C-alpha cells in the first residue's frame, strides 16, 4: 500500500517540477551515505580504541546532485600514526628499580611512553627530516634502518566496517529516506 502512494507521489511531483524527484533522490542518497560514514566510524573507533573523530575525518563524501545521483565515499585506509592520539608523555613505572649491576629490559629506569590512552614500551619521540614529530620504536629484524614510526593498522577494520554498513544501511534506510525527501520536495513545490 505504501509503495502505491510513493509511486503516485513521484508521478505527481514529476508533473509539477522536473527537478523535484531527482532532488529528492539526491537528498536521500546523501543522508544514507553520511549515516553510513558515521556508523562505520563508530564501529572502527570501538574496535581500534581510537577517537571517533580521528576515524571519521578519514572518510570523504562526494555528495550526490540532481544531475549525478551518485554519492561517492572515499576512505583513507592508511595506518594511523600514534602521535595523532593525543599528548605524549613519559611515565615512570612504579615497579621496584633494579639493583646495581643487574640488567633489565626496561631502559631508563622503567619509564614508558604514554600517548593518549596507549602505553608504548621502548618508544621515543623524534623529529623527522620532513619536520614532523613522530613516535618511533626500535624494530627487531630490520638491519638497515632499525627504527620505525609506531602506527595503528586501520586498513582491515575500515574495509570490513564500510562494506558491512553500506549494504545494510542502503537496504534499511534508503526507502524511508526517499519517502521523507519526496514529502519534503512536495511541501517545497506546494509553497511556491
Curated annotation (Swiss-Prot):
Annotated function: Stabilizes the tail structure and acts as a connector between the end of tail and the portal vertex of the capsid.
Species assigned in the record: Escherichia phage lambda (Bacteriophage lambda)
Cellular-component GO terms for this entry: host cell cytoplasm; virus tail
Tagged with keyword Transferase: no
Cellular localisation: Virion; Host cytoplasm
Keyword Signal applies: no
Alphabetically ordered keywords of this record: Host cytoplasm, Late protein, Viral tail protein, Virion
Family the entry assigns: Belongs to the Lambdalikevirus tail completion protein family.
Pfam families listed in its UniProt record: Minor_tail_Z
The protein's name: Tail completion protein Z
Amino acid at each position: 500500500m505504501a509503495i502505491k502512494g510513493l509511486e503516485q507521489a513521484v508521478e505527481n511531483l514529476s508533473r509539477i517540477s522536473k527537478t523535484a524527484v531527482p532532488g529528492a533522490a539526491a537528498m536521500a542518497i546523501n543522508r544514507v551515505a553520511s549515516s553510513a560514514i558515521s556508523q562505520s566510524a563508530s564501529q572502527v573507533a570501538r574496535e581500534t580504541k581510537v577517537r571517533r573523530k580521528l576515524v571519521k575525518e578519514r572518510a570523504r563524501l562526494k555528495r550526490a546532485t540532481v544531475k549525478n545521483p551518485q554519492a561517492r565515499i572515499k576512505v583513507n585506509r592508511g595506518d594511523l600514526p600514534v602521535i595523532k592520539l593525543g599528548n605524549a608523555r613519559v611515565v615512570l613505572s612504579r615497579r621496584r628499580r633494579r639493583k646495581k649491576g643487574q640488567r633489565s629490559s626496561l631502559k631508563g629506569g622503567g619509564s614508558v611512553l604514554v600517548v593518549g590512552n596507549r602505553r608504548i614500551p621502548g618508544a621515543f619521540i623524534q623529529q623527522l627530516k620532513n619536520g614532523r614529530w613522530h613516535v618511533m620504536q626500535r624494530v627487531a629484524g630490520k638491519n638497515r634502518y632499525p627504527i620505525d614510526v609506531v602506527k595503528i593498522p586501520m586498513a582491515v577494520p575500515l574495509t570490513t566496517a564500510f562494506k558491512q554498513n553500506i549494504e545494510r544501511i542502503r537496504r534499511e534506510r534508503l526507502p524511508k529516506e526517499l519517502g521523507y525527501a519526496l514529502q519534503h520536495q512536495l511541501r517545497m513545490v506546494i509553497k511556491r
